[in-house]
Amino acid sequence: MRFINHGVCGATLILAAGGAAAADSSVTLYGVVDANIQYLDNGGVHSYSEKSGGSTGSLFGLKGTEDLGGGLKAQFNVETGFNVNNGGLFADTSALFYRQAWVGLSDARYGSLTMGRQYEPSFRVVCPADPFRANEVLSPFSANVLAIDRNTLSTQYDSGRASNSIMYQSPDLKGLKLYGMYAFSATVSQPVPATTGNMLNVAATYSGYGFYAGLAYVNQHPGQETIAGLPTSLSLLGTEHFIGALAYRIGIVNLQFNYSYNRAQDPAPGSLAAHLGTGHSLSIAELGATIQATPADAITIAGVQRNVRGAHDNAPSFELGVDHSISQRTSLYMRAGYIKNNGTATVSWPGVTVTAPGTKQVLATVGMTHRF
């Protein structure tokens, strides 16, 4: 075993019995350490705290490939997240590699087939069209997707990652990529304990000439979730997701837009979901831009609108970000955001509990990111 330093890519572990095999197989250790100081006004309750993952989630992982000959490769990736402020695992503490854990085969001519816990095709569609790249802590898009809202508790959200999944990804067809995923039932603990049903997730993206476009369709089968304070488990209704994303670069400005509509099935008459009215459909729209002001400075801005159908429940939110690169691996950043809940809406930054429906949140943070 020997170490090879690849700079930004981190340290590479080459596992081989001899010199010839060393050129055919590799394992790369990589990661991100991100910490920030945050001010939050949560419905009039003010607080200061240290947080992890404000720009990019703090993480580390291992990925590797083996050349099998004839253009065929075996590959794997295992990746976990952690809180740099206390050293604990991030979010789902029951899973060691909660971010990614998959293995598969790839071929430059035919594409790749992978199995395990992996990013969904629909997430791959949205990410390039969100200025904050669907960050789990401070992206306003993620705040709206992950909102724990009474009117939509039974409407399944698009989580971004799927366990027990198998996915095909086509090769790059002159800018066009196709994705198809099927995931079997899985149990999760975040943001609430739940068992999701099987899921079909398909997508297509195109990138070229400064233009990006993506479409995705998701069909999630029914499941169950546990909500504190309810006498029994709550049904997760079968939910369809329709997602579109666009981006266009004009000089130093990259304009970005995405829209998603989550359509839930009607709850069974007499069920707890029907009695509580937790199965409303909803839409999320985001418009923003990324501005590369200088080679070292980027400005990001986004506005998001979440609307729940059939209820007085909507939440406009805005966020501004500035990132300054000190080196290829180290950067400083600032974020300032605002969420206004209207009616019964309870949208919040991930990990923050809303003090009461209809309240606002104001957030400001400064932090540092280092990649290895």
PLM feature spans:
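Transmembrane beta-strands of outer-membrane beta-barrel proteins
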Residues: V27-A35, G70, A74-V78, L113, ...
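Detector for outer-membrane/organellar transmembrane beta-barrel domains
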Residues: N201-E319, R335
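Outer-membrane beta-barrel architecture
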Residues: G61-K63, W102-L105, M167-Q169, A203-T205, ...
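N-terminal signal peptide c-region/cleavage motif recognized by signal peptidases
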Residues: A17-A20
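Outer membrane beta-barrel
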Residues: D24-L40, Y48-F184, T196, T205-Y209
